[in-house]
């Protein structure tokens, strides 16, 4: 088996990302919400935090990554002839290539460590990172998945960041169990 990849190929499954340009084709029930978020982004009215919740295995992670891909794509904000924002990332620009390679400087993904919890050190690191200037896209994006796996200290540290957002950033909390999040996080 040949494991060598061409420069233009995308092997993003290992990175936990969805291939740019193929973002929502398998989730037609998500298009309306996706379009609403993209319109908010285009008008400058997108909140600094989003809670993506729902039953397990309905595409929450895929949806979150579709938003990240479109936000960090350097050509996805073009408006089509009918006035609608581009639905998905192009897959060809530098931003898409960096995201596919898992090296985009304006994106971080927080997942539980070996203990199966997202620890306070991870949250503190991402809070410090969010406070720095974005390098490519003008916006820094963080996905916390599953957000309900934060321990109490992590959740409180994240709450401070949600109450006092730093810079132009978006924090997406993805969970199948929103009731496990602190009520103060859910209300932000």
Briefly describe each language-model feature range:
Residues 2-153:
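Clamp-loader machinery-focused feature within the broader ASCE/P-loop NTPase space
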Residues 58, 179-180:
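Short alpha-helical
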Residues 63-67, 125-126, 157, 161, ...:
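Alpha-helical scaffold elements adjacent to nucleotide-binding pockets in ATP/GTP-utilizing enzyme cores
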Residues 90, 178-179:
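Alpha-helix N-cap/helix-start and coil->helix boundary motif
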Residues 131, 156-176, 183:
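Conserved catalytic/switch belt of AAA+ P-loop NTPases
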Residues 145-147, 173-178:
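A short beta-strand-to-loop transition that corresponds to the Sensor-1 phosphate-sensing loop
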């Amino acid at each position: 088996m040949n494991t060598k990849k061409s420069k233009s190929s995308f092997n993003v499954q290992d990175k936990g990302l969805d291939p740019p340009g193929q973002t929502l084709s398998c989730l037609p029930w998500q298009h309306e919400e996706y379009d609403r978020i993209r319109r908010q982004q285009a008008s400058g009215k997108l909140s600094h935090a989003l809670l993506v919740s729902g039953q397990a295995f309905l595409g929450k992670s895929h949806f979150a990554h579709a938003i990240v891909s479109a936000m960090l794509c350097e050509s996805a904000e073009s408006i089509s002839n009918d006035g609608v924002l581009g639905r998905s990332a192009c897959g060809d620009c530098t931003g898409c290539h960096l995201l596919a390679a898992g090296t985009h400087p304006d994106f971080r993904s927080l997942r539980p460590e070996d203990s199966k919890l997202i620890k306070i050190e991870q949250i503190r690191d991402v809070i410090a990172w969010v406070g720095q200037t974005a390098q490519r896209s003008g916006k820094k994006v963080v996905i916390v998945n599953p957000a309900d796996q934060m321990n109490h200290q992590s959740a409180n540290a994240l709450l401070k960041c949600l109450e006092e957002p730093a810079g132009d950033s978006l924090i997406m909390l993805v969970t199948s169990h929103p009731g496990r999040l602190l009520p103060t996080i859910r209300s932000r």
